[in-house]
Amino acid sequence: MIQLFRVVISEQIIDNSEPVKCKRRTTLGKSLLFSRVLYREWWPATYCSRVSGYRDILPELDLVLWLIKADDRALSVDEYFWRHILQCGHQQVLFVVTQADKTEPCHEWDMAGIQPSPAQAQNIREKTEAVFRLFRPVHPVVAVSARTGWELDTLVSALMTALPDHAASPLMTRLQDELRTESVRSQAREQFTGAVDRIFDTAESVCIASVARTVLRAVRDTVVSVARAVWNWIFF
């Protein structure tokens, strides 16, 4: 079933509000996954028993993480929700195949090397491809094992890419230290400056006076450069 995670609520570029909210469903490994990825608690939301409850909250979300267990073969409810309830929000969804270490043959998982056996790797590949064929999402399907830590860095990279630029840096500050790599920090910084840059696009589009547009263009590069320079000070 669908899992909704509120990564950033506000449309502001800098936001320290509740970073993550979840719509509950048991046995998917949500708690373990997020405790391995985030160093702060995530806030579980109340269960939505009505379709309208999901529809009401979707516009508030920057990203939806849709969790599917690696050994889950019954996806008819997920498919119905995707096609009939989610409607126009497909670009907000990142599919994650969880508990990859339980993929058959599960006894072959390499605990020392923290990786699947060749047979498991093939089955995981087939699972992610099957999920992609069924849902045709905008973003690639990611497979992870929260219990072993396998591919959590890939999940973080996918999250950063899928998030709107204004939401990447607030999420990055809440990652576990080992996942907040220089590459992730660099990506968040560039997305932050990109968000600042687009503010000028919006401002120019609503400016009627040519003088005002000229002034905006003159200060644009300076402001974006300053934003890049002070990024570390703002978020750390």
Swiss-Prot record:
Any one Gene Ontology BP term: tRNA wobble uridine modification
InterPro entries in UniProt? P-loop_NTPase (IPR027417)
Tell me a GO cellular component.
Answer: cytoplasm
* Cysteine pairings via disulfide bonds: none
Describe the family membership recorded for this protein in Swiss-Prot or TrEMBL: To E.coli YfjP and YkfA.
What name appears for this protein in its UniProt entry? Putative uncharacterized protein YeeP
Q: Which organism is it from?
A: Escherichia coli (strain K12)
What gene makes this protein? yeeP
